[in-house]
Amino acid sequence: MIHNNRLRIVMQKNWKLSSDSKDLLVRCGIKINLCKQKLIAFSENMPIDVMCVRDDDIPGLIMDGIVDIGIIGENVLEEEVLSRKLRLDSVDYIKLKRLDFGVCRLSLAVPIDKEYTDIYCLNNSRIATSYPHLLKKYFDKKNIIFKSCMLNGSVEVAPRAGLSDAICDLVSTGATLEANGLREVQIIFRSKACLICKTGNISVEKQNVINTLMTRIQGVIKARESKYIMLHAPIKKLEEVIDLLHGAERPTILKLAGDDSRVAMHMVSSETLFWETMEKLKLLGASSILVLPIEKMME
């Protein structure tokens, strides 16, 4: 049983966002036993219950006020918003934060041998998709007439099977399109995972848990975006070294025993440190360069 005084979080049960969502909760310090056989799991150390459902059920559970918070892809969220508007259902929700996973794009793709110059080549075409409302919204803005072929899976096989002239589907790397003789021609929607919350009254107790959770999520994301850097640098080149590294704050500078010409520098870099940057540091005389991952971070 889910208790009303506990924060209710809903997330995808299977597929792409499931493992990343679980990892986020674990990194936020939420002790919870999630498994495929259980639809509901209860946190051992926080007043939080987690429901695992189909991804396209998540927006409705939030907008109908059944659960408090959801982790969902923006593509699924926007498609459901458009669908619910047509049905005159409530579409109230608050987007708390875009997350750092679930990156993809909804794109149009055509057979490799199909002549294509611009989007208007698809006028009066039949297009297979799992996102008919997002597709219609995009084509309506372009005043393009089309016929929709609704498929809930294996959209990429539709042209080869003679079901459609083109497809509109999610793309991550493009490898699946290429394997099915298709090429991406137009991005119509860019998506990431996001954290959404229901509107309406939320108890003080639940709001406190939400605030704690948001602080921890921000810390997890910030830590994943940052690296802890330690190196030795010549004092004369110190400012040039610092300029190469974009830090959250000014670095910590320490004297080196028995060497007055060099110092040790420690800092949190807010950007990924590429090999090219490390090579530039080396040219400035830096040595003993260490780049370490950060597990948790709070500013």
Swiss-Prot record:
Catalyzed reactions per annotation: 1-(5-phospho-beta-D-ribosyl)-ATP + diphosphate = 5-phospho-alpha-D-ribose 1-diphosphate + ATP
Mechanisms controlling activity: Feedback inhibited by histidine.
Keywords: Amino-acid biosynthesis, ATP-binding, Cytoplasm, Glycosyltransferase, Histidine biosynthesis, Magnesium, Metal-binding, Nucleotide-binding, Transferase
Xref: SUPFAM superfamilies: GlnB-like (SSF54913), Periplasmic binding protein-like II (SSF53850)
S-S pairs: none
Pathway: Amino-acid biosynthesis; L-histidine biosynthesis; L-histidine from 5-phospho-alpha-D-ribose 1-diphosphate: step 1/9
GO terms (BP aspect): L-histidine biosynthetic process
UniProt-listed PROSITE patterns: ATP_P_PHORIBOSYLTR
EC number: 2.4.2.17
Broad EC category: transferase
The protein's required cofactors: Mg(2+)
A GO CC term attached to the entry: cytoplasm
Family matches, as Pfam families: HisG, HisG_C
Subcellular location: Cytoplasm
Molecular function GO terms recorded: ATP binding; ATP phosphoribosyltransferase activity; magnesium ion binding
Source organism, top-level taxon: Bacteria
Self-association and partners: Equilibrium between an active dimeric form, an inactive hexameric form and higher aggregates. Interconversion between the various forms is largely reversible and is influenced by the natural substrates and inhibitors of the enzyme.
Protein family: Belongs to the ATP phosphoribosyltransferase family. Long subfamily.
Function: Catalyzes the condensation of ATP and 5-phosphoribose 1-diphosphate to form N'-(5'-phosphoribosyl)-ATP (PR-ATP). Has a crucial role in the pathway because the rate of histidine biosynthesis seems to be controlled primarily by regulation of HisG enzymatic activity.
NCBIfam families according to UniProt: hisG, HisG_C-term
Protein name according to UniProt: ATP phosphoribosyltransferase
Lineage, highest ranks first: Bacteria, Pseudomonadati, Pseudomonadota, Gammaproteobacteria, Enterobacterales
Originating gene: hisG
